[in-house]
Amino acid sequence: MANRLAGKVALITGGASGLGAAQAKRFAEEGAKVVIGDLNEEMAKGVVAEIRAAGGDALFIRLDVTDAASWNNAIAAAVEAFGGLTTLSNTAGIIHPGGFEEESIEGWNKMVAVNQTAIFLGIKAAIPELVKSGNGSIINISSLIGMFPTAGNASYCATKAAVRIMSKAAALEFVDRGVRVNTIVPGGMNTPITANVPPDVLKQQTSQIPMGKLGDPIDIANGALFLASDEAKYITGVDLPIDGGWSVGV
């Protein structure tokens, strides 16, 4: 099936690499106009160039997801370029290990700002345009350890759990205004962020995956594509695990 996102305009945070870049390319393949919001201009423009070379339509907007003014500018730029906004994918995120004794308040606050508060800011900034579209979709990226926490990841577990509950609250708040809000819950993934996971932790996580391997960014992109499409018009407030069966065995 082609052009599953024809007529859609999608803003994807963290779109310069990893899960966000995979979504940007996949969305464009299916006809969406894509806005990549990121701080890494060089990598983001590389993704934009790939999309355009393949015949898609995309642009880069510098976006600091922790800053409300930056969000407002990004939404305005998307509307100016493409006439509106139908889809928001909150994919930007960070991770660093640290239990309750090791984690600093600075590290905690940074994790909360990027992984949690940024999603609040994004929803707040985008919702007027999403409502105006008449068929808006918000996709927030959580993590399996936001459902099943692990020791030694205090701030990451907390922020990714918050993403799930915040998504459900938003789903209820905007359901009668034509905006769906869903969460993707990735298991272990082959992404740049995985490089920050200690090898012993990564090995342990992989051993718990029934499929016996990490997922790839395209797996998340295909899930996000479905949730962004009209095929998911009756789906809101759900957690969609994409984890190789990991959550089944937890």
UniProtKB/Swiss-Prot annotation:
NAD(+) binds at residues 38, 64-65, 156, 160, 191, 194. Keywords: NAD, Oxidoreductase, Plasmid. Pfam families: adh_short_C2. SUPFAM superfamilies: NAD(P)-binding Rossmann-fold domains. The active site is at 156 (proton acceptor). PROSITE patterns: ADH_SHORT. GO terms for molecular function: 2,5-dichloro-2,5-cyclohexadiene-1,4-diol dehydrogenase activity. It is an enzyme of class 1 (oxidoreductase). Gene3D superfamilies: NAD(P)-binding Rossmann-like Domain. Its EC number is 1.1.1.-. It catalyses: 2,5-dichlorocyclohexa-2,5-dien-1,4-diol + NAD(+) = 2,5-dichlorohydroquinone + NADH + H(+). Belongs to the short-chain dehydrogenases/reductases (SDR) family. Catalyzes the degradation of 2,5-dichloro-2,5-cyclohexadiene-1,4-diol (2,5-DDOL) into 2,5-dichlorohydroquinone (2,5-DCHQ) in vitro. LinX appears not to be involved in gamma-hexachlorocyclohexane (gamma-HCH) degradation pathway, in contrast to LinC which has the same enzymatic activity. This is 2,5-dichloro-2,5-cyclohexadiene-1,4-diol dehydrogenase LinX.
